[in-house]
Curated annotation (Swiss-Prot):
ATP binds at residues 11, 72-73, 102-105. This is ATP-dependent 6-phosphofructokinase. It is found in: Cytoplasm. Belongs to the phosphofructokinase type A (PFKA) family. ATP-dependent PFK group I subfamily. Prokaryotic clade 'B1' sub-subfamily. Homotetramer. Keywords: Allosteric enzyme, ATP-binding, Cytoplasm, Glycolysis, Kinase, Magnesium, Metal-binding, Nucleotide-binding, Transferase. Allosterically activated by ADP and other diphosphonucleosides, and allosterically inhibited by phosphoenolpyruvate. The keyword Secreted does not apply. Catalyzes the phosphorylation of D-fructose 6-phosphate to fructose 1,6-bisphosphate by ATP, the first committing step of glycolysis. Pfam families: PFK. The gene is pfkA. The lineage of its organism: Bacteria, Bacillati, Bacillota, Bacilli, Lactobacillales. It catalyses: beta-D-fructose 6-phosphate + ATP = beta-D-fructose 1,6-bisphosphate + ADP + H(+). Substrate binds at residues 125-127, 162, 169-171, 222, 243, 249-252. GO terms for biological process: canonical glycolysis; fructose 1,6-bisphosphate metabolic process; fructose 6-phosphate metabolic process.
Length: 320
């Protein structure tokens, strides 16, 4: 093997650049050539491919977003489009592809694997919803951004005796809501993985008022419903001075945390080591702080990410 390709796909996540750097540098230091593919699978099919230079990778480990850009490209679900992508890879002499991204990105790598092309998936998404890994690149940064925003909102809630319903990202997973909610002492954390009772939440906030806590913070995962809708339903069960806030895309950007930079570096280097061993068709990740690799087809077809819902029980035990 002489050449590998790298692409980022789907929603951007802080730490993707650190992964790109690690993959490219590890490949170059092993005597391989690294090729970047701009705009994800769309750029792959269009041949937007270039040879990477080590000197251009010096200042990206600390940057959010992705220097390779990203684009949604649902057309890659079609067999004909997948084969066009493989043609481009062969045209550039690229013998293996490392894909950094989330669920949709992994399915693209899975399809390439099914066509006999060597691909490895690196988990990069703020949602932390990829099977085969405890944590994804970008999750820690997003959770920290959400935590900082919730701390600020809580200051205002305290000052004005208000109840805030704050919607955080996560797609269909409640991990960002759970982790940021626990870290900010939320009165309630509402996630898709568990049933919830809005009336019971309202009663708890009313009870808190009687016991001396005159403000409230509800952290809501976007996979449940929107903040405005939740607030409207909450207000039916109490006389609250409530506000609804959606944090939105602020959770994706910004400098990655130390955890995301190190995780991305470990996973990027691991992808190259596996390729050098002649292995491929894999989804890589981290489990109990150990790097792991699983068959990407089996991982996507037979496994699901498991959100640690016991964290919600923890929050219930330590809240006001």
């Amino acid at each position: 093997m002489k050449r590998i390709g790298i692409l980022t796909s789907g929603g951007d996540a802080a730490g993707m650049n650190a992964a790109v750097r690690a993959i490219a540098r590890s490949a170059m230091n092993a005597g391989l050539e690294a090729y970047g593919i701009n705009y994800g699978y769309k750029g792959l099919v269009e041949g937007n491919i270039f040879k990477m230079e080590s000197t251009k990778l010096d200042e990206i480990i600390n940057r959010g977003g992705t220097i390779l850009y990203s684009a949604r490209f649902p057309e890659f679900a079609e067999t004909e489009t997948q084969l066009k992508g493989i043609e481009q890879l062969k045209k550039f002499g690229i013998e293996a592809l490392v894909v950094i991204g989330g669920d949709g990105s992994y399915h693209g790598a899975e399809k390439l694997t099914m066509h006999g092309y060597n691909s490895i998936g690196v988990p990069g998404t703020i949602d932390n919803d990829i099977p085969g890994t405890d944590f994804t690149i970008g999750f820690d940064t997003a959770a920290n951004v959400a935590m900082e925003a919730l701390d600020r909102i809580n200051d205002t809630a305290t000052s004005h005796q208000r109840v805030f319903v704050v919607e955080v990202m996560g797609r269909g997973a409640g991990d960002i809501a759970l982790w940021s909610g626990i870290a900010t002492g939320a009165d309630a954390i509402v996630i898709p993985e568990r049933e919830y009772d809005i009336e019971a939440i309202a009663n708890k906030i009313s009870e808190n008022r009687k016991n001396g806590k005159d403000h409230g913070l509800i952290v809501l995962a976007e996979g449940v419903m929107g903040a405005a809708e939740f607030k409207e339903k909450l207000d039916q069960y109490g006389d609250f001075d409530s506000r609804a806030i959606t944090l939105g895309h602020i959770q994706r950007g910004g400098n990655p945390t130390v955890k995301d930079r190190v995780l991305a570096t470990r996973l990027g280097d691991y992808a190259i080591r596996l390729l050098l061993e002649g292995k491929g068709g894999l989804a890589i990740g981290i489990h109990d702080n150990q790097l792991v690799a699983t068959d990407i087809i089996d991982t996507l077809e037979n496994h699901k990410h498991q959100t640690d819902v016991s964290l919600q029980d923890l929050n219930d035990r330590v809240r006001f």
